């Protein structure tokens, strides 16, 4: 059902309805303190430049004559200033007072003491990205709103003015570049996408993890500022401690020195920085290590001279030796700039000489003819053992038991043909393989549709909950997909092909979900199930009223179960008012601030976004359904739904699906009446039922979760399997492509050693869109290869420790 935007009501900013930017914690003149404290684009480092002699000396001793002085805290941090590193008056040292705006994409961190008291928004990585997105939208809106007022001063109120948003006008107008500081290689991708979304001029501070996803770097058209802060080999006392060091940590240590060379190989322009170095004296030794790992000396020199000068808009003053340019020079002795024995003799800044002290750089204890173990790469190439194992034109399975989960039911001695990623035939037919067909003919195998998990929190970076506010409809799980998680491989090993990644249950209105296919090896965007309708997480019960959060959490509304429906009513009412204002603006009225929270709720009202609601108790379930019916909204799924069996008729009448736990009960007070027969009872009453994992571990054996519907309630085997295949596909509105083995659907299937509901059966192969992503024997070989790589890296790390003692 679709709601209209013409409902009468108070203005959009009526706080009684819970509307207005202040409610969201989005930075504004009257905004919530949390977001304001981390959004400070008006900060100017030119006003704060007051370096101590020790800092200046350390940089000059490494050969630097000028530097870009950057803000180091917050999300939108402020404007950097390019300064000379001479010892004169700091005000006279400023060469360019406004260089770049800086934005950090990193999950907020808190101490153990801070975790026991309320935190301000944003409290998660997805919240940080939402703050950046909303603030940039607000900056655009301020410019548009003031322009409209200047043309219509007599017909509307004067708009508010924010110095913070005014500071972002050069950014949104593409007059000032933005340096994004992502915390991981996947956030490099997100930074580039944000820059594209808002047509910004981006630079990227490299994370040191670019080796993980060179394919992502290949597609990013932005210069990189590259630290030479490499992790050191950990010194551990005995072999057992070494064995406990994770392979991924050793890989990161081994790959790090080659990061700059990799970026140049991928065609990215780089500038080098001392950022992250605990000791500036490590800069030149680390740079020589980067050169040994493939960075050319010419590229290294350019990355310290011409490139940063041009990126900072100072190519006419710095970066090369030429008449008319500033007299900034670095003099080396004992060889060229980056030779092993060369050293900085002196620097000249604005025509003044600064001699470098004579110092003995640490030399390796090993003999000169002993090669440095870090000069070569031992770790396996990134992503080499991920991605499709087979990509045939067609795949034909013969002599199998097909569990179609469609009208044909279970078929013995059947065949399945998949071509170009789509199912062509399923059943008993003459199966003659054509050219390029991969044939699977194994005795006793069973084939099911790929399993689907309707409630997962796996593969989410930087926090599952944005729990700082009662409504966080503006945050998006799609912004923080973790394509590098080993969980992908582990869940493929259980036959899982699709997962509904949900925000947590910390608030009555949570964040937007993301449905993915488990295409292990793909980048974050490659995981997304593109045709899946948009959705959002809601929640009821103990979690949202904070009764289980601790004594310090007593100020956020709602604090009672009866407050939850009131809150939902407030936010949906606010969304109606927002829709009316947007409609009025489209018909010539004043522009309306785009509000990402209310926009998402408006999509629910328009039938464009599905609700997946965490729910336990029957009274709350009924109250929630009645509130939604009042707004002409049909709930897509009630998640967990532990007391759903008590109100099964009402749920069926509403038309909501039930995505339930198979057999969870008595793990907290509000689930004391939960029973393992709930799924079967709701199924009998005509509710579309699925079983979900809510657990990265349980998601590895969803077939056995389905089997519990047979044990508890006597559901037929074929119907029970649908609880983890066709039914969740229908709940997610993706059943046109997934959930059953029928012609025209995606070639997503799992091959089992025996009956799929038998505890003794194992998944042999998992295919997605006609590509093989898991094969049991290949997985064994993968584990063996990783073990050998782990041992080799441990030995290399031990040698490196000895070489620097």
Regions found by a protein language model. Give the residues of each.
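Histidine-rich, glycine-flanked metal-binding segment
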Residues: 1-12, 17, 407-448
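Intrinsically disordered, low-complexity segments enriched in small/polar residues
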Residues: 2-32, 143-159, 231, 240-247, ...
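Aromatic/His-enriched, Gly/Pro-containing loop or helix-boundary segments
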Residues: 9-55, 315, 442-443, 457-461, ...
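N-terminal pre-domain segments of enzymes
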Residues: 10-28, 364-391, 793-795, 800-802
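Polyanionic/metal-chelating signatures
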Residues: 49-202, 206-211, 338-344, 349, ...
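C-terminal cap of metal-dependent C-N hydrolases
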Residues: 322-364, 400, 742-786
């Amino acid at each position: 059902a679709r709601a209209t935007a013409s409902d009468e009501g108070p203005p959009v900013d009526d706080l009684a309805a819970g509307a207005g930017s202040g409610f969201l914690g989005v930075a504004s003149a009257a905004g919530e303190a949390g977001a304001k404290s981390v959004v400070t684009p008006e900060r100017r480092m030119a006003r704060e430049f007051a370096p101590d002699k020790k800092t200046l000396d350390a940089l000059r001793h490494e050969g630097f004559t000028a530097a870009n002085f950057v803000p180091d805290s917050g999300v939108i941090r402020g404007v950097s200033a390019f300064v000379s590193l001479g010892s004169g008056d700091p005000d006279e040292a400023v060469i360019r007072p406004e260089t770049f705006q800086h934005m950090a994409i990193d999950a907020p961190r808190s101490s153990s003491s801070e975790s026991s008291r309320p935190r301000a928004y944003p409290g998660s990585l997805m919240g940080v990205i939402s703050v950046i997105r909303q603030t940039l939208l607000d900056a655009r809106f301020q410019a548009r709103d003031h322009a409209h007022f200047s043309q219509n001063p007599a017909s509307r109120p004067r708009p508010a003015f924010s110095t913070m948003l005014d500071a972002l006008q050069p950014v949104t107008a593409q007059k000032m570049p933005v340096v994004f500081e992502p915390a991981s290689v996947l956030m490099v991708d997100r930074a580039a996408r944000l820059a594209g979304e808002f047509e910004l001029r981006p630079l990227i501070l490299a994370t040191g993890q670019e080796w993980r996803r060179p394919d992502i770097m290949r597609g990013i058209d932005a210069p990189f500022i590259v630290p030479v802060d490499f992790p050191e080999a950990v010194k551990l006392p005995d072999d057992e401690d070494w064995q406990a060091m994770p392979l991924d940590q050793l890989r990161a240590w081994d790959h790090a020195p080659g990061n700059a060379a990799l970026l140049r190989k991928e065609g990215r322009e780089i500038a080098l920085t001392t950022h992250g170095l605990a000791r500036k004296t490590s800069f030149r030794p680390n740079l020589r290590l980067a050169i040994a790992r493939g960075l050319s000396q010419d590229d290294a020199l350019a990355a310290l001279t011409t490139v940063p000068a041009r990126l900072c808009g100072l190519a006419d003053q710095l970066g090369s030796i030429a008449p008319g340019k500033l007299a900034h020079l670095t003099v080396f002795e004992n060889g060229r700039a980056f030779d092993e024995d060369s050293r900085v003799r002196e620097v000249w800044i604005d025509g003044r000489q600064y001699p470098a002290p004579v110092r003995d750089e640490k030399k390796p204890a090993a003999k000169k003819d002993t090669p440095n173990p870090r000069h070569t790469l031992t770790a396996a190439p990134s992503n080499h053992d991920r991605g499709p194992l087979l990509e045939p034109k067609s795949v034909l399975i013969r002599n199998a038991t097909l569990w179609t989960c469609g009208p044909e039911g279970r078929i013995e001695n059947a065949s399945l043909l998949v071509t170009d990623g789509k199912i062509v035939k399923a059943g008993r037919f003459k199966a003659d393989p054509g050219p390029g067909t991969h044939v699977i003919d194994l005795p006793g195998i069973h084939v099911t549709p790929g399993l689907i998990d309707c409630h997962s929190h796996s593969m989410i970076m930087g926090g599952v909950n944005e729990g700082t506010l009662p409504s966080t409809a503006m945050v998006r799980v799609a912004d923080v997909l973790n394509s590098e998680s080993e969980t992908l491989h582990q869940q493929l090993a259980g036959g899982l092909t699709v997962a509904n990644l949900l925000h947590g249950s910390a608030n009555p209105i949570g964040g937007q979900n993301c449905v993915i296919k488990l295409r292990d090896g793909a980048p974050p965007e490659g995981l997304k199930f593109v045709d899946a309708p948009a959705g959002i997480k809601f929640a009821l019960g103990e979690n949202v009223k904070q009764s289980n959060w601790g004594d310090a959490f007593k100020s956020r509304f709602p604090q009672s179960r009866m407050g939850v429906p009131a809150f939902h009513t407030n936010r949906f009412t606010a969304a109606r008012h927002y829709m009316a204002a947007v409609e009025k603006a489209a018909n010539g009225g004043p522009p309306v601030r785009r509000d990402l929270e209310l926009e998402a709720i408006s999509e629910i009202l328009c039938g464009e976004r599905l609700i997946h609601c965490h729910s336990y108790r029957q009274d709350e379930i009924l109250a929630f359904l009645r509130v939604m019916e009042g707004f002409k909204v049909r709930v897509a799924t009630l998640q967990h739904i532990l007391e759903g069996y008590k109100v099964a008729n009402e749920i069926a009448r509403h038309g909501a699906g039930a995505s339930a736990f198979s057999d969870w009960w008595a793990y907290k007070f509000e689930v004391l009446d939960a029973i393992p027969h709930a799924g079967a009872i709701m199924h009998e009453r005509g509710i579309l039922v699925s079983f979900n994992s809510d657990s990265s571990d349980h998601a590895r054996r969803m077939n056995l979760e389905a089997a519990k519907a047979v044990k508890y309630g006597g559901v037929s085997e074929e119907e029970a399997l649908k609880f983890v295949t066709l039914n969740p596909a229908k709940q997610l509105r993706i059943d046109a492509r997934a959930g059953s083995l029928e012609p025209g659907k995606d070639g997503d299937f799992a091959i089992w050693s025996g009956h799929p509901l038998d505890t003794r059966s194992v998944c042999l192969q998992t295919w997605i869109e006609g590509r093989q992503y898991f094969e049991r024997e290949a997985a064994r070989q993968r584990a063996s290869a990783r073990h050998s790589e782990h041992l080799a890296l441990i030995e290399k790390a031990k040698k490196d420790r000895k070489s620097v003692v």
